[in-house]
Each structure stands twice: as C-alpha cells, then as structure tokens.
Amino acid sequence: MPGYYALKPSGSQFMFNLKADNHQTILTSERYESKQNAQRGIESVRENCRDDARYTRKSSKASEPYFTLTSTNGQTIGLSEMYSSTAAMENGIESCKRNGPSLDEREPA
C-alpha cells in the first residue's frame, strides 16, 4: 500500500507531510501561504522524489543525519526527520522515492 500526503493548516498557512503506509512521517514541507501553493509543493515532490540527485544528505549540529529534497530550481521542497544513522537516513530516502509518487492526499476532518 503506498503512502499519502497529509495536507493541513498551520495557523493561517498550510503545510504537508509525506507519510508511509504505516503513518510514519517521511518528509515535512515548509509552510505555504495558501492551500493551492501547498498542493503545488506536493506535485513538486511527486516530480522530483525518484531522482537521487534531488536529495541532499546533511548532518545536524548533533551529528544526526537527515536529508532535504529539492526541486530542479534548487528550492527545498521538504525536510526529513533526524536519523540515528546514515543507513537509517538512506532507508528514509528510499521510502521517499517509493511513497512520493502517491496521488493520495488527505486533509483533517
């Protein structure tokens, strides 16, 4: 079963999380001024998630690995959680590649 996008309001703005089928968050977006812009961000994830060159592997100040997904214009689309190891981060990237193409968008009731 593929993952899904959880689209939700954040104050007066909107954001989304890409979630795996077990409901674990894989990628968190920035905040967008409108729901329509957040939906464009979701479309950008779909378009870019399978291209390994779109992922930037990073390390936090506490040496925790994480990744960002960027669009072809270099803008960050989303940010992962902090992982306990590089291998766990690579698994997160693979999960993003598998679940990112999902057409399933969900909003809170």
Question: Across the structure, where does each feature detected by a protein language model lie?
Answer:
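Intrinsic N-terminal pre-sequences and regulatory tails
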Residues: 1-4, 109
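A structural feature that tracks compact, well-ordered secondary-structure segments
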Residues: 6-8, 15-20, 26-32, 41-44, ...
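Intrinsically disordered, low-complexity regulatory segments
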Residues: 10, 20, 102-109
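Alpha-helical recognition helix of canonical C2H2 zinc-finger domains
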Residues: 38, 89
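Short arginine-rich
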Residues: 46-54, 97-106
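Cysteine/selenocysteine-centered motifs that mediate thiol-based redox chemistry or coordinate metal-sulfur cofactors
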Residues: 57-62, 107-109
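Short, mixed-charge low-complexity intrinsically disordered segments
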Residues: 62, 70, 102-105
